UniProtKB/Swiss-Prot annotation:
The lineage of its organism: Eukaryota, Metazoa, Chordata, Craniata, Vertebrata. Its main location: cytoplasm. GO terms for cellular component: cytoplasm. This is Inositol monophosphatase 1. Its cofactor is Mg(2+).
């Protein structure tokens, strides 16, 4: 049987490339920066422009499909995931990087049907790296097949995480205490490039062994999640249970052994789900 979603994926790859052009062009100009949920949660006119471009283009071609977009949700739309084919879009993952010219900025497009990830695209605009993953077909970066590492020993692992955009002292305390606990196991190190999507792609590429974070949103992980699993990795909840796209937390790991060990070590931050009011 023909793959019903391949055409959607091909179209999304083209759109992600076009969105990357807009992002690169915008970096040459003065930008208008706005603040969302905290002084460190930033949005620019380019985020809004790219999301509008992506959703408008996809809606024209696939009018019956649903959408969850970071900037649409910020403007008051709900992020409710149904069984309908749904595009989950982060127009610029790494807005703070974008604002500062720090060179890790991604366009992320995830496509979910019956609440299951079908394909994901993460385009690293300044590196010109197009990461793609399609259910059952593998994960690639610029056409090269991706494969996770085989590192199961946490003491020999390189992890990726972020400090997040919350500036609430208690949340910051938990984030830093989790990092301290992991570093002192010890492990080889902790890195972070400032975007959830690219951190996950680094796990898919075998450059890092696992990524964990709490406080992310569905649009941060919907594109990269399937890239990780198609590269041979696993997605788990930070409790060690099954991954839930709307839960705002994830461990993306090269293997389950490492993911479960991370889950055992970290303290959980209480968060409101993406699909709660």
């Amino acid at each position: 049987m023909a793959d019903p979603w391949q055409e959607c994926m091909d179209y999304a790859v083209t759109l992600a490339g076009q969105a990357g052009e807009v992002v690169r062009e915008a970096l040459k100009n003065e930008m208008n920066i706005m603040v969302k949920s905290s002084p460190a949660d930033l949005v620019t006119a380019t985020d809004q422009k790219v999301e509008k471009m992506l959703i408008t283009s996809i809606k024209e071609k696939y009018p019956s499909h649903s959408f969850i977009g970071e900037e649409s949700v910020a403007a008051g739309e709900k992020s409710i995931l149904t069984d309908n084919p749904t595009w989950i879009i982060d127009p610029i993952d790494g807005t703070t990087n974008f604002v500062h010219g720090f060179p890790f900025v991604a366009v992320s497009i995830g496509f979910v049907v019956n609440k299951k990830m079908e394909f994901g695209i993460v385009y690293s605009c300044l590196e010109d790296k197009m990461y793609t993953g399609r259910k059952g077909k593998g994960a690639f970066c610029n056409g090269q097949k991706l494969q996770v590492s085989h590192q199961e020993d946490i003491t020999k692992s390189l992890l990726v995480t972020e400090l997040g955009s919350s500036r609430t002292p208690e949340t910051v305390r938990i984030i830093l205490s989790n990092i301290e606990r992991l570093l002192c196991l010890p492990i080889h190190g902790i890195r972070g490039v400032g975007t959830a999507a690219l951190n996950m792609c680094l796990v898919a590429a075998g450059a890092a062994d696992a990524y964990y974070e709490m406080g992310i949103h569905c649009w941060d992980v919907a594109g990269a999640g399937i890239i990780v699993t198609e590269a041979g990795g696993v997605l788990l909840d930070v409790t060690g249970g099954p991954f839930d796209l709307m839960s705002r937390r994830v461990i993306a790991s090269s293997n389950k052994t490492l993911a479960e060990r991370i889950a055992k070590e970290i303290q959980i931050i209480p968060l409101q789900r993406d699909d709660e009011d």
